[in-house]
Amino acid sequence: MRYKRMYIIILAYILALFLAGLVFDDPADILPGLQKIAETQDVLITDYVAIAGPGAAFVNSALVTLISTAVLFLARCPLNGFTITEIGLMSGFALFGKNVVNIWPIFLGTWLYARIQKEPFSKYSSTALLATALAPLVSYMGFGSLYAHPLGGIITGVFIGMVLPPLSAYTYKVQNGMNLYNMGFACGLLAMMLVPILTAVGDAPSSVLYWAEGYNRPFGAAMALMCLVFIVGGLFFSGRPAWAAWAGY
């Protein structure tokens, strides 16, 4: 199947993210930057480029993308348009809220839910990835809350990972498939319950603004190159003549 070769393309994309991190920043700053990213409270708006530099941000994106791909592969979840979209979401938001630390408790919670239900994790692997929309809450409970403790972040993430599979199944019935962002809807409902609870105990998250500027040209050039590679790859490496690939589009 044509989607099987996508693993090679995804790995090449991950490598490109690593290389971008090395190009855009001093390699010596990447590991300290990753530590900053892992320990930030992730309250909106937290731009990883602003707090840790572009190198650490891109390497974090590469690592999160690699972990997400590995989760799908080990769960034997077939690659298709939906799962590739999930990988893209993980990659993009790893510049802005998701990191190599705060996604794991949510994965664990979803895995535990699958074990309790006595069902394969592959059935919920996509839910596990999309549930990391609330990964910033894990970081907040671990590093930013008045009651911050790493164990609190882990417990919060496990709770999120266990609650969202049944909640997303319910919200799908509510909107009857009319909302393409069903997991976003479910995550929003859960956040609407959790944040008021924090506010009630005097722990309301305060908004911040870490927003990087001055990268328009280099990032714009990198984005243009990436889009060009995708277009050329789709036209000439899809196993069909270029005109047929274009006609299919």
What residue spans do the PLM features occupy?
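Structural signature of transmembrane alpha-helix termini at the membrane-water interface
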Residues: 19-23, 70-74, 115-116, 138-141, ...
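Membrane-helix interface and helix-disruption motif detector
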Residues: 49-53, 76, 92-101, 120-121, ...
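Juxtamembrane interface elements at the cytosolic ends of transmembrane helices
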Residues: 193, 201-206, 230-248
